[in-house]
Amino acid sequence: MRVLGIDPGLRRTGFGVIDAEGMRLRYVASGTIVVPPALALPERLKVILDNLREVARETRPDVAALEIVFLNTNPASTLLLGQARGAALCALADSALDVHEYTALQIKKAVVGTGRAAKEQVQMMVQRLLSLDGTPAPDSADALACAICHAHVGPLHDKLDRLGTAAQLGSRPRLRNGRLVG
């Protein structure tokens, strides 16, 4: 499974692509889309949209993972970040990719083992898990961490979704209150 991870931002949007076979991970590509701050908001969003479309076209991922926007103390910043995230979602939808979303806490827990990990810890674990020669840039590391999180957690979620669908169709096994019942 090839996973495209995205760390959305209006100034800098990180992307990272990995291949995952079971628990084995392989680095494919990563980078940061730097958006010129002098551009008007619509043009800034278009830069994100166009660049992520190009990344998806070139790397041909099977699925995408995106970090969920956190609530900031500054509502205006949260709205702007949400718009950058919207541009990323449009690029992924345009590329016909299934999108899975994870909180920063979920991503850090999946990659480092604790949801309270510092950025440097995430960078170090991404470097180790993907056997990279150097430490990835912060935005790229966050995007790669998002992809790694999906590689570890996504298949389990898919199985649970299928079990839930089977329960709705009346076959066994079934889920009740989030628990498997037989």
Swiss-Prot record:
EC number annotated for this UniProt entry: 3.1.21.10
GO cellular component, one term: cytoplasm
Record: residues binding Mg(2+) 2: E67
Leader sequence segment: none
One Gene Ontology biological process: DNA repair
Enzyme class: hydrolase
Disulphide connectivity of cysteines: none
Catalytic reaction(s) noted: Endonucleolytic cleavage at a junction such as a reciprocal single-stranded crossover between two homologous DNA duplexes (Holliday junction)
Residues the record lists as binding Mg(2+) 1: D7, D139
Keyword annotations from UniProtKB, A to Z: Cytoplasm, DNA damage, DNA recombination, DNA repair, DNA-binding, Endonuclease, Hydrolase, Magnesium, Metal-binding, Nuclease
Cofactor dependence: Mg(2+)
UniProt cross-references to InterPro entries, sorted A to Z: RNaseH-like_sf, RNaseH_sf, X-over_junc_endoDNase_Mg_BS, X-over_junc_endoDNase_RuvC
Residue intervals passing through the bilayer: none
Gene Ontology terms, MF aspect: crossover junction DNA endonuclease activity; DNA binding; magnesium ion binding
Keyword Electron transport: no
Cofactor note: Binds 2 Mg(2+) ion per subunit.
Active site: D7, E67, D139
Subcellular location, record wording: Cytoplasm
SUPFAM superfamilies: Ribonuclease H-like
Functional summary from the UniProt entry: The RuvA-RuvB-RuvC complex processes Holliday junction (HJ) DNA during genetic recombination and DNA repair. Endonuclease that resolves HJ intermediates. Cleaves cruciform DNA by making single-stranded nicks across the HJ at symmetrical positions within the homologous arms, yielding a 5'-phosphate and a 3'-hydroxyl group; requires a central core of homology in the junction. The consensus cleavage sequence is 5'-(A/T)TT(C/G)-3'. Cleavage occurs on the 3'-side of the TT dinucleotide at the point of strand exchange.
HAMAP family documented for this protein: RuvC (MF_00034)
Self-association state and partner proteins as the record states: Homodimer which binds Holliday junction (HJ) DNA. The HJ becomes 2-fold symmetrical on binding to RuvC with unstacked arms; it has a different conformation from HJ DNA in complex with RuvA. In the full resolvosome a probable DNA-RuvA(4)-RuvB(12)-RuvC(2) complex forms which resolves the HJ.
Protein family per UniProt: Belongs to the RuvC family.
Protein name: Crossover junction endodeoxyribonuclease RuvC
Source organism (scientific name): Bordetella bronchiseptica (strain ATCC BAA-588 / NCTC 13252 / RB50) (Alcaligenes bronchisepticus)
Gene name linked to the record: ruvC
